[in-house]
A protein has these predicted regions:
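Short acidic/polar hinge/loop motifs at secondary-structure boundaries
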Residues: 62-90
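Flexible loop and strand-edge segments within Gram-negative outer membrane beta-barrel domains
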Residues: 166-186, 194, 198-230
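Extracytoplasmic loops and strand-loop junctions of Gram-negative outer membrane beta-barrel proteins
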Residues: 69, 88-89, 123-131, 142, ...
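Flexible glycine-/small-residue-rich
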Residues: 46-50, 58-60, 90, 110-112, ...
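Outer-membrane beta-barrel translocator/receptor signature
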Residues: 81-84, 95-107, 112-172, 180-187, ...
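Short beta-strands and strand-coil junctions in structured, solvent-facing domains, enriched
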Residues: 31, 53, 63-65, 92-96, ...
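N-terminal periplasmic "start-of-domain" segments of outer-membrane beta-barrel proteins
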Residues: 1-14, 43
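Extracytoplasmic beta-strand/coil segments of soluble accessory domains associated
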Residues: 20-62, 84-85
Length: 230
C-alpha cells in the first residue's frame, strides 16, 4: 500500500487547476475526462480499479453525488483553494474504509479556521484553451471566489463562495451550434464548537448549483436554430 500526500504548498503552485487536474498528475492515478468539457462525467482509476472501487472522503466523511445515476462524486465540485491536504492511498483499503475502497482512497482535508476572529481572502482565475485558432469561440474559463473564517470564543467557522463559468465550444459537427456553456456556484460551510480539550463538534455542509447546456443529438436532422441550441 502506498500513500501519496499533496500539501497546501503543492496546491498553491497549481492555481487555476481543478482537483481532477491535480490528481491526474499523481503517479498511478488516472482521471479519465479531466481535460474534457466541464459537466462531463469523470472516471477514477487507481491500480486497475475504477469509480466504484475508489472511495472519496472529505474531512473523514464519505461523499457521493445524489444528482448522478451512479452517485459518483465529481471532484471538480470542490474548490482547490479550500483544501489543506490530499492523501491518495493506492492499494486495497477495504479493511479501513469498506468495500468501496477495493483499490484506493482519495482523502481530502479542508482548511481549518484561523484563531483570530475573522480572516478572509478572495481570488480570481482566468484562462483560455486557445481554441479560437480553430473555432469561432475561445472557450474562456472564469473562476472566482471569496472565503471568510475565524474563531470566536469556542465557535469556529468557515464560509466560502465560489463560482465557475466556462464559455465552452460545441461538440457537435457543423457551424450552427452554440457553445456548450457551463456554470457552477458552490457554497461550502464548516462550523465547529470546542466544548473542552477532550470534546469538540464540527458540522460540514456543501451546496452546488450547476447549469450545463448541450446540443441536439440527432445527426443530420434539420431543425430550426432554437431546437439546435436546446
Amino acid at each position: 500500500k502506498i500513500i501519496e500526500v499533496i500539501t497546501a504548498q503543492d496546491l498553491e503552485a497549481k492555481k487555476g487547476q481543478n482537483l481532477a487536474n491535480v490528481l491526474s498528475q499523481v503517479a498511478g492515478v488516472e482521471i479519465n475526462g479531466n481535460q474534457s468539457f466541464s459537466g462531463k462525467n469523470l472516471g477514477y482509476y487507481i491500480r486497475g480499479g475504477r469509480n466504484r472501487q475508489v472511495a472519496i472522503y472529505i474531512d473523514g466523511v464519505p461523499v457521493t453525488d445524489a444528482s448522478g445515476i451512479n452517485l459518483e462524486y465529481d471532484l471538480r465540485l470542490i474548490p482547490v483553494e479550500q483544501i489543506e491536504k490530499i492523501e491518495v492511498m493506492k492499494g486495497a483499503s477495504s479493511t479501513l474504509y469498506g468495500t468501496g475502497a477495493a483499490t484506493g482512497v482519495i482523502n481530502i482535508t479542508l482548511k481549518k479556521s484561523v484563531k483570530k476572529e475573522i480572516s478572509g481572502n478572495a481570488y480570481i482565475n482566468m484562462g483560455t484553451q486557445n481554441t479560437s485558432e480553430t473555432s469561432k469561440t475561445s472557450a474562456q474559463d472564469f473562476n472566482q471566489g471569496v472565503s471568510l473564517n475565524g474563531t470566536i470564543n469556542k465557535v469556529s467557522y468557515m464560509t466560502t463562495l465560489n463560482s465557475t463559468e466556462t464559455k465552452g465550444m460545441s461538440e457537435a459537427a457543423g457551424e450552427d451550434f452554440e457553445e456548450d456553456t457551463f456554470s457552477r456556484v458552490n457554497v461550502l460551510q464548516k462550523i465547529g464548537f470546542k466544548a473542552n480539550d477532550q470534546l469538540s463538534f464540527e458540522f460540514f455542509g456543501n451546496y452546488d448549483r450547476i447549469k450545463n447546456t448541450f446540443d441536439n443529438s440527432f445527426d443530420g436532422f434539420i431543425a430550426n436554430s432554437d431546437d439546435l441550441n436546446n
